[in-house]
């Protein structure tokens, strides 16, 4: 079982005790938590320490002692996007820092642009990757931003192993400058996030990403790649072509008894749906448009937001100005709600979760 939001307090002979007081039987414990960087030697040597606790270095990785250079996990770096001091314990940046420091010793100039924190990992058969700023950190840094959450297939649907990829793209408003991305799925999420890392490093915009030509074969991806699709949706949001709300607001909408339309087919709806939602399949929308009010906000969703987008545009074409798409739709809602329901022990807002 997976336990979230409850840290380990003590490890005993036959069990571990969590911060909540709960105990878990255990014959063996693997601590996959990494090692904290050690700066004790630097402090003892009188080197200046930065505000984040890392060794303070200049753009060439020279410390406060002109005869000492420092690189790697123990140093303080700066965030490329915000310009603020940061720490980053990753092998890739450490290797680049080592090369730059060696060059500096020989008088070769270094173009130190800071870090964007590109990273990836695998957890229980799922791959996750991220780069740049997430939405929370962008707002914390005072950068006006927005985001889109898309869930396209990671390759052509008829290919073996095709699976949904959850992809979130963060961009600056109103410039469209790409700030970062996060992705999770069973496929090559690192490939997509690497593309965004390159765009971030070159100050690329969603327009650049929309037109980016990438490798395509049905076994590797789709003709309109995940990142291209995210850029198209982002452009629609940036230019006000439609409105959206994130999955984080759906619980409030359900509790407020908002008018939520599920445009999936009846069979999909019966397997699991938002409590209080109305099922009007996209295939029946023309005949049932009069069931949708114009005097209050209407929130649309499907499985992954593609059909609900089509429904929204059709309704806007019929004069509806009160329709809003739920970004991430039912797959995104279920993942977000399940995690928080387990962590907080709260009542679910769906009849059944659906993760596929």
Predicted features, each with a name:
Residues 14-17, 22-100, 195, 199:
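FAD-site-proximal beta/loop scaffold in flavoenzymes
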Residues 2-4, 68-70, 145-147, 260, ...:
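Conserved beta-strand scaffold positions in the cores of enzyme catalytic domains, especially
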Residues 4-13:
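A conserved short coil-to-beta-strand element within the FAD-binding core of flavoproteins
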């Amino acid at each position: 079982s997976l336990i979230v939001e409850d840290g380990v307090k003590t490890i005993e002979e036959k069990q571990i005790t969590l911060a909540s007081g709960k105990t878990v039987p255990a014959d063996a414990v693997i601590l996959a938590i990494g090692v904290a960087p050690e700066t004790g030697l630097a402090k003892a040597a009188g080197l200046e320490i930065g505000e984040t606790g890392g060794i303070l270095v200049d753009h060439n990785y020279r410390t406060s002692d002109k005869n000492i250079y420092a690189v790697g996990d123990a140093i303080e770096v700066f965030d490329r996007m915000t310009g603020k001091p940061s720490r980053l314990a990753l092998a890739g940046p450490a290797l680049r820092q080592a090369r730059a420091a060696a060059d500096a010793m020989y008088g070769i100039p270094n173009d130190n642009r800071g870090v964007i924190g590109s990273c990836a990992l695998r957890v229980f058969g799922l791959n996750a990757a991220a780069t740049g700023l997430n939405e929370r950190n962008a707002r914390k840094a005072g950068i006006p931003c927005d985001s889109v959450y898309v869930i396209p297939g990671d390759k052509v649907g008829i290919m073996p192993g095709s699976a949904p990829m959850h992809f979130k793209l963060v961009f600056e408003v109103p410039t469209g400058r790409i700030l970062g991305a996060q992705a999770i799925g069973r496929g090559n999420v690192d490939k997509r996030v690497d593309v965004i890392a390159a765009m971030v490093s070159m100050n690329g915009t969603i327009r650049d990403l929309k037109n980016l030509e990438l490798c395509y074969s049905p076994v590797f991806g789709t003709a309109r790649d995940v990142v291209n699709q995210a850029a198209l949706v982002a452009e629609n949001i940036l230019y006000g072509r439609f409105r959206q709300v994130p999955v984080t607001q759906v619980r409030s909408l359900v509790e407020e008894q908002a008018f939520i339309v599920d445009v999936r087919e009846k069979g999909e709806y019966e397997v699991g749906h938002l409590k209080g939602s109305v099922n009007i399949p996209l295939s029946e929308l023309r005949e049932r448009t009069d069931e949708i009010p114009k005097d209050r906000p209407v929130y649309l969703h499907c499985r992954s937001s593609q059909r609900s987008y089509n429904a929204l545009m059709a309704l806007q074409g019929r004069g509806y100005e009160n329709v809003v798409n739920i970004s991430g739709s039912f797959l995104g809602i279920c993942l977000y709600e399940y995690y928080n329901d387990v962590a907080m022990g709260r009542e679910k807002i769906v009849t059944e979760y659906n993760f596929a």
